[in-house]
Amino acid sequence: MSAAASPRSLTLIGAGLAGCLLAILLSRRGWQITLYERRGDPRIKGYESGRSINLALAERGRHALRQACAEDAVMAKAVMMRGRMIHPVSGEPQLQRYGRDDSEVIWSIHRAALNVTLLDLAEQAGARVHFYRRLHTVDFDAGYARFIDDRDDQPHEIHFQALVGSDGAGSALRAAMQRKAPVGEHIAFLDHSYKELEIPPRADGGFRIERNALHIWPRGRYMCIALPNDGGTFTVTLFLPNEGMPSFATTRSGDEALALFARDFPDALPLIPQLKEHWEEHPPGLLGTLTRERWHLDGRAVLLGDAAHAMVPFHGQGMNCAFEDCVALAEQLDAHSDLSEAFAAFEAARRDDAAAIQQMALENYLEMRDRVGDAQFLLQRALEQQLQARWPTRFVPHYTMVTFLRTRYAIALARSEIQREILLEATHGHTDLSRIDWVALETVVHARLEPLEGAH
């Protein structure tokens, strides 16, 4: 379709987090936005997402929400997390702060609460939302799309100018684009899966464990995490290998899950009274990384968020990255009247950064499950904090760049690799920081790391 036919009209597939945020951003710019969602209205029917892992909202995501005038409404439902609360098999939990103080924190928010908030704001901005519309087929040449209402199998056909795929990792639009022209899709599944559980609130409605932290029970090849909700509950997620001992293959029944928690997560077990029932009710979820050689089909379709570059959840950046995508696409639509140019420029602007955070998310899993209790890791963390205190604009911790700043992911990855080398070399053979050669370190830091924009 020619961009001149209806230059300010887009059809969005998927009314999840990214779809709703993009709808707000573009509706506020004067675009006519229509969203089609395969599920029912969550405000009426209740939330039906295939996954409910809590989301970690960082500065990137908050910046995108500010662009849409949505930050205040979202933050009212978020819970602050100061750091990781590490739970050993025995002994007291220890807090590892994310940043220097409470200005450097992340926020936990329940996916359903966030989706409903953004959905309300999208409609208020003027977007139209159609529920029970599962994308079935697309005729890209004629500009027609057919949807099916799964309640009665009735078809619904529409005419479109261009489609935006914000329909997640299992994107139906991506599949339709693949049928039209191969897009070089590759999915690498992790050899681990996850299962969701819940810590209920106390009888008085309060939190059973520290509310302002992301709780981690690291156990080497596997781990359990818990993120707070604003209603006093915690969403618990167990990440476990698919095979081996222990694994989902060896922990099938609720009784086997009880035995696993009694042995490896003894302080978590009494917090999850419905462990057995939830274990048997909730199937394991898959974890994977999606890459594609092309995110758009000239000016007729484009993908963003998980539909373009799904990642494992271990850096808490999937949503934040998708929200950055929304802002980037809106900016390219501002800059280019031709949709094919806008979509191509969007992909060019975001491809390297998406690949970088996908890599960092995989690396963070190893850190969370294997290293957070390791003495050498803790020594490197201590040195990292000292280097940041001495040269705050040059030595900026990895987590700070990714989470508290909006440093491009690709730049954060490149700098993090240099900083990791510096930390490894400086701590080699040491058990504490008393014999660190600070003069030599200053020379290395200034030689290898330029000042970073935004660091302070």
Swiss-Prot record:
Cofactor: FAD
Enzyme class, UniProt record, top EC level: oxidoreductase
GO molecular function: FAD binding; kynurenine 3-monooxygenase activity
Pfam families membership: FAD_binding_3
GO biological process, one term: NAD biosynthetic process
Pathway linked to the protein: Cofactor biosynthesis; NAD(+) biosynthesis; quinolinate from L-kynurenine: step 1/3
Entry EC no(s): 1.14.13.9
Reaction equations catalysed: L-kynurenine + NADPH + O2 + H(+) = 3-hydroxy-L-kynurenine + NADP(+) + H2O
Annotated keywords: FAD, Flavoprotein, Monooxygenase, NADP, Oxidoreductase, Pyridine nucleotide biosynthesis
Physiological role: Catalyzes the hydroxylation of L-kynurenine (L-Kyn) to form 3-hydroxy-L-kynurenine (L-3OHKyn). Required for synthesis of quinolinic acid.
Family under the similarity heading: Belongs to the aromatic-ring hydroxylase family. KMO subfamily.
Protein's recorded name: Kynurenine 3-monooxygenase
Gene, per the UniProt record: kmo
